[in-house]
Amino acid sequence: MSEEAAYQEDTAVQNTPADALSPVESDSNSALSTPSNKAERDDMKDFDENHEESNNYVEIPKKPASAYVTVSICCLMVAFGGFVFGWDTGTISGFVAQTDFIRRFGMKHHDGTYYLSKVRTGLIVSIFNIGCAIGGIILARLGDMYGRKMGLIVVVVIYIIGIIIQIASINKWYQYFIGRIISGLGVGGIAVLSPMLISEVSPKHIRGTLVSCYQLMITLGIFLGYCTNYGTKTYTNSVQWRVPLGLGFAWALFMIGGMTFVPESPRYLVEVGKIEEAKRSIALSNKVSADDPAVMAEVEVVQATVEAEKLAGNASWGEIFSTKTKVFQRLIMGAMIQSLQQLTGDNYFFYYGTTVFTAVGLEDSFETSIVLGIVNFASTFVGIFLVERYGRRRCLLWGAASMTACMVVFASVGVTRLWPNGKKNGSSKGAGNCMIVFTCFYLFCFATTWAPIPFVVNSETFPLRVKSKCMAIAQACNWIWGFLIGFFTPFISGAIDFYYGYVFMGCLVFSYFYVFFFVPETKGLTLEEVNTLWEEGVLPWKSPSWVPPNKRGTDYNADDLMHDDQPFYKKMFGKK
């Protein structure tokens, strides 16, 4: 027996089965041990002893960036689901300000003019998020039943059905409303399955970057949606909004076609017994031969995990409330990160940017939306670099602090120059320009940190056994907050106007402290190692110093990372 295998056997009592596995990246999120499965641990131990020779895994080496071109293109195609979501966000913000849309789906004043009431505007904009929340929980299961690829294709088809209903709407707002709910069901499934598939096929060295591409596609969709609204605003008929919807239909068809070239999740292939296909999928992702020993080793990791799952039986919804393996703690963290992403205030600008900047006296708020879309899209490229260079945790902390500063300036200028003494005081081009500048700064900070990283954190945090359930719940929290913000923003803005910015500022301050005390660093870890980090109970603010069990030296003190008796201020500002 090798020294590594001997070490793993000696530490089997104090470590989870994941510790006995290779640090090699697998397509699974973790080699899970579950709270109700003490028997599973014993079975897994027996399984490992019977396969002792396979524990001497060969790790797939890191290669130059050029070697990952193929897998990057495949992941971009999967991430195109984010473009579909972003397209809806970018176009709906303009629809509610377009004359033909208002005439068809609004109400009539006594003087013959048409308008959209706050209730109807809020419902049309935000009901999409409710559909997404339901779709994420219900339809994400398709990925477990029929594979990630087929699951994605099905939910995109559902999105297309919703688009058709919206395009076919003549003058019944509730028909358009129903279409948005159905489209939301599809996008909700996409939002869970796309990051999941990307995380499962990505090499560990670039996993964070590739998962972040989902957010990059969202920003591209928002930007091009803004541009399309700008191009159709001069029309006086339904071309204003039907052309953007029709293009959304085309984008969905493009994604379905592209999915035929994407490799299936190796984890799913192993689960259904397609071992050779799993080898080819891993080989394609890592630019190696399917007969490479490292590929065989990684398949064995997946097989061991799948075998452990089969021994344990099907995962129940109640299992997500386990505290023994920190599943419930992870779920709370994932749900909070997704909720706080919405509470940063980004959709205040994305959904109602056209309306907001009309209120500050700008002549063409559609042009302003395009500028914001460019900033948002371009900044996301920076975020793709930062997430692997500086890590998830540090980026979230930096983002919360910088966005707080931007929101303070935005709200203060609006309150003092445009809403003094709680009353609207005309408009000011100077104040409006200042607010646009700091909105751009805000969007830069958001796009580089809080926009992509919650998707990355959630895709690599949850144990394999309950992954789809936990990701769906966490994402549903994001959609629900999106609905609440989208629906109530017209009412809140009407009552307190730019004081609304201080509400988001408070949420950003809370976000900083929450990340510091509850979000661990997972940069550079395999999905199995992330599981071990959680199960060992490492304190989040000490997690950057954590070392996986099979890489520790004799002087490594694991207990030091699990306890901290320092005062509050030293935990935050003391030497780490």
From Swiss-Prot:
Regulation: Xylose uptake is strongly inhibited by glucose.
Residue intervals annotated with topology Cytoplasmic: 1-66, 144-149, 202-207, 264-346, 388-394, 459-475, 519-576
Compositional bias of kind Polar residues: 25-37
Topological type in the membrane: Multi-pass membrane protein
Any GO CC annotation of this UniProt entry: plasma membrane
Glycosylation-annotated residues: 425
Keyword Transmembrane helix tagged: yes
Region (Disordered): 1-56
Topology Extracellular: residue spans: 88-122, 171-180, 229-242, 364-369, 416-437, 497
Cross-link Glycyl lysine isopeptide (Lys-Gly) (interchain with G-Cter in ubiquitin), sequence positions: 45
Gene3D superfamilies: MFS general substrate transporter like domains
GO molecular-function term, one example from the UniProt record: carbohydrate:proton symporter activity
Residues spanning the membrane: 67-87, 123-143, 150-170, 181-201, 208-228, 243-263, 347-363, 370-387, 395-415, 438-458, 476-496, 498-518
Pfam families, A to Z: Sugar_tr
Compositional bias of kind Basic and acidic residues: 38-54
Domain of life of the source: Eukaryota
Primary localisation category: membrane
Record's keyword terms, sorted: Cell membrane, Glycoprotein, Isopeptide bond, Membrane, Repeat, Sugar transport, Transmembrane, Transmembrane helix, Transport, Ubl conjugation
Protein purpose: Low-affinity glucose transporter. Can also transport xylose.
Family named by the database record: Belongs to the major facilitator superfamily. Sugar transporter (TC 2.A.1.1) family.
PANTHER family, sorted: GALACTOSE TRANSPORTER-RELATED, PLASTIDIC GLUCOSE TRANSPORTER 4
Note: Glucose transport is thought to be mediated by two kinetically distinct systems, a glucose-repressible high-affinity system and a constitutive low-affinity system.
Protein name: Low-affinity glucose transporter HXT4
Source organism: Saccharomyces cerevisiae (strain YJM789)
